[in-house]
A protein has these predicted regions:
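Polytopic transmembrane helical bundles with strong interfacial aromatic enrichment
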Residues: 1-133
């Protein structure tokens, strides 16, 4: 879901607004979040809302992945969980760097590629036998 909202951000060029983190303007939640009517359209067409939801999903996903990797690593020393733990921090950092650099192409491309790496690491961790997780 986070990757899908990232695609919305890229497709709408929504990363070109609110180039600060964690604030979006003068608040954490953008003032024009629900500017369009009907309200559900904001989820897909409102640049500020799309960027906000990608940020929120990224933080939530990051927290879940960190907790999962830390818990799984306690039961096994398989290196995939170390890579997963470290990569999620790198991915969030790349997302923030993409924003503050006003979507500098090399950083933005690495952030998109990083999403593929993170997804691959999550799948690899889930493919281990349950007793290894």
């Amino acid at each position: 879901l986070t990757i899908v909202w990232g695609a919305f951000v890229a497709g709408l060029d929504a990363g070109l607004i609110y180039n600060t983190f964690p604030m979006m303007g003068k608040s954490v939640i953008p003032v024009e979040m629900w500017a369009h009517s009907p309200a559900w359209i904001n989820l897909f067409e409102n640049h500020a809302a799309v960027q906000f939801f990608h940020r929120a999903l990224a933080m939530f996903t990051g927290l879940i992945v960190i907790l999962y990797a830390a818990r799984a690593y306690r039961h096994t020393t398989h290196p995939v969980f170390i890579y997963l733990f470290l990569w999620v921090f790198l991915q969030i950092g790349l997302g923030i760097a993409t924003l503050v650099s006003q979507v500098w192409l090399p950083v933005a491309v690495f952030h998109q590629f990083g999403a593929v790496i993170l997804l691959t690491l999550m799948i690899a961790g889930l493919q281990l036998p349950r007793r290894s997780r």
